[in-house]
Amino acid sequence: MYVERIPIEVPTRAPTGRTACYVLGREEALLVDPPAPDERIEAELDRVGSVAVTHHHPDHVGAVAEYAEAADATVWCRRGRAEAFTPATNATPDRVFSEGTEIPTGGEPVVVRDTPGHAPEHVAFETPGALVSGDLAVAEGSVVVGDPEGDMRAYLASLRRVVGLAPERLLPAHGPEIDDVRATCERLVAHRLDRERRVLEAVEAGNRTVTDVLDAAYEKDLTGVEDLAGATVRAHLEKLAAEGHVRWDGARADPA
């Protein structure tokens, strides 16, 4: 399938400072994650038939309404998430998708794959040989999975699921394409499990608040990203509590 990748500078916490949107197919194409108006997207609108997003974060949805109207395109939304989709995008969905839905293009359809974790509605779009993966994975560094929307257990399950799908490459929203899918997903799983271990050790050592756990579990300088790191610690504590390893009431953590 023909894939056009268009990286666009937008206000984002991602290190690249850009979000890539994708045009999938040559005719009646699917436009994925248009983050902001851009003349390169506008040049493709005459062949766009549908618009969808991997999830609702602002750096992925900024031009959904504008380009759906300009292309007279079908707007797709995750089933059960329309109430969140409309205020995020200023667009009303025409159709809904769920796991396995085939979104038609002029050629082969694009298949929806559930990949929650980074956000509850997060999906990926499967084309022959590639998976448009949104914020599921990055070639370098890690992905923020932060409370309240982030679900660490779901995120790890999504990474493992993608390994099982075995796409030839991942097409992420931030950073370069990912050719070694298995190695990247396994690296991200290992990173999260190592952070989880550090969080658990911090709680067992007597740290009770998110701030205290943060100081104990992170060795690097968190200047400018303390809020993201704190949200990540809370997501780890939610997972550890669900699995019976700690007691966590949203403010205080104790060993189980």
Range-by-range predicted roles:
Residues C185, V189, L193-E204, R234-E238:
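Hydrophobic residues on short alpha-helical segments
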Residues M1-E44, V123-A139:
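Conserved beta-strand hairpin/beta-sheet module of binuclear metal-dependent hydrolase folds
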